Regions:
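Non-catalytic cap/lid and distal C-terminal segments of serine-dependent acyl enzymes
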Residues: 2-148
Length: 148
């Protein structure tokens, strides 16, 4: 039997993070958490537009508390360093949490068999086209209207 880990909420001690719990998708017929990182100085200059970077497996990008096996990518820390060094334009970063048991279905473009974590034989349904529609037609318009 496959084991699926439920991801905890990110810690609330980071004012740069905005969590959208159970963001609903019509295309995927499910919900997932979305975390948005706002760069230093966000909102200080009226009308300023920021580039947006979207990350899959979004529970991993900022907080070890929510990251798979506690290994966060620390994307906010790295972006802040690069912004302060004037090496990048300050982006808004969006972490799209995976749904655990549905992860491979959503990322795979075609049905396929693969070995699960415990060696169990698994099969993906190949829902990448629907996942792309979720990103482009549902999530991006939400991010654009709320953060840009």
């Amino acid at each position: 039997m496959a084991v699926h880990r439920i991801m905890p909420r990110p810690r609330k001690n980071n004012p740069a993070l905005r969590l959208h719990r159970r963001f609903r998708s019509h295309w995927l017929r499910n919900s997932r958490d979305i975390v948005v990182w706002l760069p230093p100085g966000y909102g200080l200059v009226r009308g300023r537009r920021h580039p947006v970077v979207y990350f899959q497996d979004g529970q991993n990008i900022f907080d070890p508390h929510t990251a798979f096996l506690g290994n966060a990518w620390h994307a906010g820390d790295r972006a802040t360093e690069l912004i302060r060094a004037h090496r990048i334009v300050a982006p808004v970063m969006v972490g799209v949490y995976n749904t655990g048991f549905n992860r491979m279905n959503e990322y795979a473009p075609t049905p396929a068999e693969f070995a699960g974590w415990d060696g169990e034989k698994c099969r993906s349904t190949g829902d990448a086209k629907r996942y792309a529609k979720f990103l482009v037609q549902e999530l991006k318009p939400f991010i654009d209207s709320h953060y840009l």
